[in-house]
A protein has these predicted regions:
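Conserved active-site "lid/cap" helical segment
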Residues: 1-18, 29, 85, 121-169, ...
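Flexible, glycine-rich active-site loops centered on histidine and acidic residues
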Residues: 65, 71-99
Length: 368
C-alpha cells in the first residue's frame, strides 16, 4: 500500500487531507493500519485516517463513498491473502495494491455516477478463526449473483448518468472470465470491451484488484472515454467514470507493466512456501532473534524509521541520514531541515560483506 501510494503521489503538489485504506488482510486488528501508511508517507499529523475491511468490495465501496467528496483523499486498496499449498486458489490468487488520489481540480477522470447494492449472497468467505477462503460452486455464484444482482446495479448507475450500455468504452469487472463474459452478454454489450483482467499475469489481488485494473486502464486511456468499474462480493458496486483532456498529459509512474517487467521469478517451490510461512525451515542459530519490537524506542524514532526522514544541513546543504547534532560534512551545529530520503537513489560508498548473515530472501545484485 505504501509503495502504491508513493507512486501515486510522485511529483504531485497536492497533500491529501485523508487516507482511506481497504483490505481483507490487515496485519493489525487493533491498530490504525492507514495510520501506519500515513506515517510512512510523512503526511501531516492532522491527516484523517480510516480502515475499510470485511469485503472484497472494500476498495470499490470506499470509492463509492467518497463520490462527491470535496476533500483530497488518498484511496488505497491492498491485499495479501493466504492460500492452502496445492490448492486452486494458490494458482489463482495474487498479492497487490493500488492507489488513487481523489479530489477536485486537475483530475484525469470524473466520476459521473455510482450505485451500490448489498445482497448477502455468499460466494466465498473467511472467518476470523480460519486462515483460508472457502469458495462456493462457481456456476451457482455466476447465475445467482453475477447475472441477477449486478445487472440491476449497472442499469441504475447508467440511468443516473443518462447513458446507454453502448456508451461505455471499457468494462472493468473484477470476477472470473466466464462471469464477466456472461454479464456483458446479458447486458447486450460487446465482450471485446472488457478491460484486461490482469489475472493471467498477477492473479486475483482481492479488494485491490478492481482498482489495479482501473489504474492500468487509465494509463492507456484517451480523452472522453467512459469506463465502468464493477466490484462484486455480498452485493455489487458500480462506478461510472469519464476521462477528460488532462488524461493525455498525465504520466503514470511505476505502472503495472513496469512492475511486471521488473519482477523477480521464484522458481523454487520450497523457498516460496518458506517465504509465505507455510513451512518452518531450520535456518540455524543466526536466524534466532527477538521478534518483539521495542515500541517505546520505535515511537521516539518513528518518523526516521517509517518515513526515512533525514536532515539537510542549513550551511553546506548536505543531506544525511539519520539527522545528527553536528553535520557530517562541515561539522556545524546549526539545525538541520527535515527531508525524506525515501525513493531516492544513492551510491554505496563502502560495504562489509557478511556471508553468514541470516536472510530468507536476500536481494540479488543487478542493473536497475
Amino acid at each position: 500500500a505504501v509503495e502504491a501510494a508513493r507512486n501515486c503521489l510522485k511529483n504531485s503538489t497536492e497533500v491529501p487531507t485523508s487516507v482511506t485504506l481497504g483490505s481483507t488482510t490487515f496485519p493489525f486488528a487493533d491498530r490504525s493500519n492507514s495510520g501506519v501508511v500515513a506515517d510512512a508517507l510523512n503526511l501531516p499529523l492532522q491527516t484523517q485516517t480510516e480502515d475499510v475491511f470485511g469485503s472484497r468490495r472494500a476498495g470499490t465501496s470506499a470509492l463509492v463513498r467518497h463520490f462527491r467528496g470535496s476533500s483530497s483523499t488518498l484511496l488505497l486498496a491492498s491485499d495479501c491473502r493466504e492460500t492452502r499449498p496445492g490448492s486452486t486458489q494458490e494458482m489463482q490468487y495474487g498479492h497487490g495494491a493500488a492507489s488513487l488520489l481523489l479530489g477536485t481540480g486537475d483530475t484525469l477522470a470524473d466520476i459521473i455516477s455510482v450505485e451500490s447494492v448489498h445482497e448477502d449472497l455468499i460466494d466465498q468467505y473467511r472467518t476470523v478463526e480460519t486462515k483460508y477462503d472457502y469458495a462456493l460452486e462457481e456456476r451457482w455464484v455466476r447465475e445467482e449473483g453475477w447475472l441477477k444482482i449486478v445487472p440491476e446495479t449497472i442499469k441504475s448507475a447508467l440511468n443516473k448518468a443518462n447513458l446507454e450500455i453502448g456508451h461505455v468504452d471499457k468494462f472493468i469487472v473484477h470476477g472470473t472470465a466466464s462471469a464477466a463474459r456472461s454479464l456483458l452478454k446479458k447486458l447486450g454489450a460487446d465482450s471485446k470491451k472488457l478491460a484486461d483482467s490482469l489475472q493471467s499475469n498477477i492473479g486475483d489481488c482481492g479488494c485491490a484488484h478492481p482498482l489495479l485494473m482501473l489504474t492500468n486502464t487509465l494509463a492507456k486511456a484517451t480523452t472522453g472515454q467512459h469506463f465502468m468499474v464493477v466490484g462484486f462480493g455480498q452485493g455489487s458496486d458500480v462506478i461510472l467514470l469519464k476521462t477528460n483532456d488532462k488524461i493525455a498529459q498525465s504520466k503514470f509512474y511505476q505502472s503495472v507493466d513496469i512492475h511486471l517487467n521488473n519482477k523477480r521469478v521464484v522458481d523454487n517451490y520450497a523457498l516460496y512456501l518458506s517465504l509465505r510461512n507455510h513451512i518452518d525451515i531450520d535456518f540455524g542459530l543466526r536466524s534466532e532473534r527477538d521478534n518483539r519490537t521495542a515500541l517505546s524506542a520505535y515511537y521516539r524514532k518513528r518518523r526516521e524509521i517509517s518515513a526515512m526522514l533525514g536532515g539537510r544541513c542549513a550551511k553546506c546543504n548536505t543531506l544525511q541520514f539519520p539527522r545528527s547534532l553536528l553535520c557530517v560534512s562541515c561539522g556545524t551545529d546549526e539545525p538541520q531541515e527535515e527531508e525524506s530520503l525515501s525513493g531516492l537513489i544513492g551510491r554505496v560508498k563502502s560495504f562489509t560483506e557478511v556471508r553468514y548473515e541470516f536472510g530468507k530472501s536476500k536481494p540479488k545484485a543487478g542493473k536497475r
